[in-house]
Amino acid sequence: MRHKPQIIKMRWLGVAVTLLVLYASSAWAFSINDVAKQAQLLASESYETPETNLPSIFRDMKYADYQQIQFNHDKAYWNNLKTPFKLEFYHQGMYFDTPVKINEVTATSVHQIKYTPDYFNFGNVQHDKDTVKDLGFAGFKVLNPINSKNKNDEILSMLGASYFRMIGAGQVYGLSARGLAIDTALPSGEEFPRFREFWIERPKPADRHLIIYALLDSPRATGAYRFVIMPNRDITVNVQSKIYLRDKVGKLGIAPLTSMFLFGSNHPSPMVNFRPELHDSNGLSIHASNGEWIWRPLNNPRRLAISSFSTENPQGFGLLQRGRQFSRFEDLDDRYDLRPSAWITPKGKWGKGSVELIEIPTNDETNDNIVAFWTPDQLPEAGKEINFKYTLTFSKDEDKLHAPDNAYVMQTLRSTGDVKQSNLIRQPDGTIAFIIDFTGRKMKKLPQDTPVAAQASIDDNGTIVESSVRYNPIIKGWRLTLRVKVKDVEKITEMRAALVNGDQILSETWSYQLPADE
């Protein structure tokens, strides 16, 4: 329905008055509650689709052209101030065609950071300065001397919808986080909320953290977010969110992570490729409320696959990149071996719900085809506030992301099952073999003759033909070999396995889904 111009003016006059009241207070009083008031106001009104003001030369450009538009590093925000952080901005272009408002919060005021084309070097992109002078930014990035005290490196990028990416020391960008996911993988189609406005607190010279506030908006939800960014060897952000639904949603994804898995050791490439593995993440890790650790290796299935792990008050979950030897990837350009894992640690009790994993078929590495989030069993009524707090850590230290007394899966290898004959020649027997290597800080200290055994199971669509365990001296762990026979290849097959020593559980649970048509 088209709104009359005067109605729109009156509505935004009310928002302007609200903003004036908010900004009248000093910076130390600015909080997530100020942003929440705006989110509540938006939730009480009908959604207005943001309008693009982008000239066609920018809207229709290809990725290579967009890459030519580079921020002028000499004009980084706070460049002339003694702060540990600097800001740079993204220009609009391609599908980044809607401006976001970016504000600076100081000790005495809140003011908008104005767009100017002078911030950017446009390369060979022809443009009229008069048509771009009031465009606004597509997003921003944060810089910090995380690798060297004399050089500022990018540590955070906020660009597109509610996506953001972070990296710690020695890491390169890989998977992304999001503010909120709505109706992911449902037949009705996914809704992508977007951060429409940011408030960034100017850091003091001695600050080791940066505080960012964000206002989220979408047709059926609004939200207020507070991010406390803490860069180090790993980078950590404390997230606080206040979410308000405008209308009913089918599925609400809290603390969503988005990644890519094309092929790997458990799901080899269908074509010959010099890279043995190609992925930003290779598994979903879950620390359930009952203490169980679960590892689900990722797949690139031929059909959409949705897995749900019921867990009340989860202790943590994340999409991890396990196994960082360069030889596993052999990619000098994209350095998948340096891409971080992302781990969510909930704060407080989230209640009853599930960690959900969505695997989407893809033919190339440019498509993010993996999504993971926690979704509550019961959704709130429209307008009612729901709160979630959690810590998000991006790390290359997989030992740090797992309990020291619980062994974890280092790798899952898949092979054609076979039997060694009396003449020592291996003969395929129609089975599929999985070789799973377990290791861990406590497991490495176990004597080699420890009687480690496996507890393994498979659903009604398969039979376990072999389950054997042997010590692996290379990793100071144990290797489990499973050979399984699938009854109907057009159906999904579920398997589970863990290592034990008598009644003592030694490892996490390997929870594998063999996709249909494999």
From Swiss-Prot:
Pfam short name (any one): MdoG
Query: What GO terms in the biological process aspect are recorded for it?
Result: beta-glucan biosynthetic process
Q: Sorted alphabetically, which keywords does the UniProt record give?
A: Periplasm, Signal
GO CC field = outer membrane-bounded periplasmic space
**According to its UniProt record, which protein family does this protein belong to?**
Belongs to the OpgD/OpgG family.
Localization, per the record, is: Periplasm
What's the source species' lineage?
Bacteria, Pseudomonadati, Pseudomonadota, Betaproteobacteria, Nitrosomonadales
Q: What is this protein called?
A: Glucans biosynthesis protein G
Signal sequence segment = 1-29
Q: In which pathway does it act?
A: Glycan metabolism; osmoregulated periplasmic glucan (OPG) biosynthesis
Stated role: Involved in the biosynthesis of osmoregulated periplasmic glucans (OPGs).
Record GO terms (molecular function): carbohydrate binding; catalytic activity
Question: Which superkingdom?
Answer: Bacteria
